[in-house]
């Protein structure tokens, strides 16, 4: 019976994947398969496609199997208010499914003396306890991340890399839960993008905005105050490393590092490997140290 339930869960995942993949391929057609920063962010006159066209933002993937060495069964917050005292722990499986959706659209172009573009973006990451029949297969955590992004093209060289863009974003991220499991934060994120041959680099320092009711006052000490994304693409393979750090270089240095590999299998089917270690894989896990490994399929990559 248990084996049948597992097979049914896997069937649901792959049925969902092929359904979503067909919709995404129709939405992001060949005209939106963007292979560099200039095309993805419309940084010159030859790449401009106008406003309100939905295009990829961050990677989209489905991981039927995502393993954690330290499932967060009783989340706790740095907020000492009694409302944030969690009840006894939940028996979560250390294997679950994970998937990410992410897209953006340009709403204004040619702002700031004709050079800047204003974008709206949305990313959603879901963690699904699909193999946990005892808990009726709940979604353990869903993070919602809308952004308003101002992007400005630039053209100069630094350390052999070509700077392609700079900008700033207003970012909100929350998990939509009530106390004691509510987690959220608002950030002003500065960014810069660089390219050199097969390499692409994003640098993103950020400032956290204060909140009257703070679900997680110490989140920056765990998740970090900025991140670095290094991407290498060759022969259909795309490798990405993302590292975040709290910029505290004492014994309380914390952050997260993740490595992903998207590799071609056949036609549009691409495998996806995602490995991470540190804090903040999700908002509810912002202060939970864990190592995770996920295997699945890629829908959209960084490039």
Summary of predicted features, one role per range:
Residues 24, 32, 174, 209-211, ...:
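Intrinsically disordered, low-complexity linker/tail regions enriched in polar/charged residues
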Residues 273, 290-303:
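Outer-membrane beta-barrel "beta-signal"
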Residues 23-132, 143-146:
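Outer-membrane beta-barrel initiation region
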Residues 227-228, 232-242, 246-274, 279-282, ...:
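Long, repeat-rich segments with strong aromatic
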């Amino acid at each position: 019976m248990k084996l049948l339930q597992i097979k049914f869960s896997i069937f649901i995942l792959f049925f969902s994947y092929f359904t979503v993949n067909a919709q995404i391929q129709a939405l992001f057609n060949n005209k939106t398969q963007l292979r560099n920063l200039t095309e993805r962010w419309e940084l010159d006159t030859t790449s401009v496609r106008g406003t309100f066209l939905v295009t990829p933002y961050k990677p989209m993937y489905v991981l039927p199997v995502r393993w954690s060495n330290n499932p967060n069964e009783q989340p706790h917050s740095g907020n000492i208010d009694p409302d944030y005292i969690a009840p006894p722990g939940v028996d979560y499986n250390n294997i679950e499914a994970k998937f990410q959706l992410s897209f953006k659209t340009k709403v204004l172009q040619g702002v700031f003396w004709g050079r800047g573009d204003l974008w709206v973006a949305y990313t959603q990451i879901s963690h699904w306890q699909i193999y946990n029949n005892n808990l009726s297969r709940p979604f353990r955590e869903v993070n919602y991340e809308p952004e308003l992004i101002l992007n400005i093209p630039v053209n100069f060289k630094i350390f052999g890399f070509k700077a392609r863009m700079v900008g700033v974003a207003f970012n909100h991220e929350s998990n939509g839960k009530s106390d004691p499991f509510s987690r959220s934060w608002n950030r002003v994120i500065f960014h810069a993008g660089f390219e050199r041959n097969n390499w692409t680099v994003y640098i993103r320092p950020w400032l956290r905005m204060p909140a009257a009711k703070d679900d997680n006052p110490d989140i920056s000490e765990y998740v970090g105050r900025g991140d670095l994304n290094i991407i290498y693409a060759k022969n259909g393979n795309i490798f990405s490393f993302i590292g975040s750090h709290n910029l505290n270089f004492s014994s309380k240095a914390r952050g997260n590092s993740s490595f992903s590999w998207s590799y071609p299998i056949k036609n549009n089917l691409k495998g996806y490997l995602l490995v991470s270690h540190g804090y903040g894989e999700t908002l509810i896990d912002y202060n939970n140290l864990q190592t995770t490994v996920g295997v699945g399929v890629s829908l959209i990559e960084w490039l």
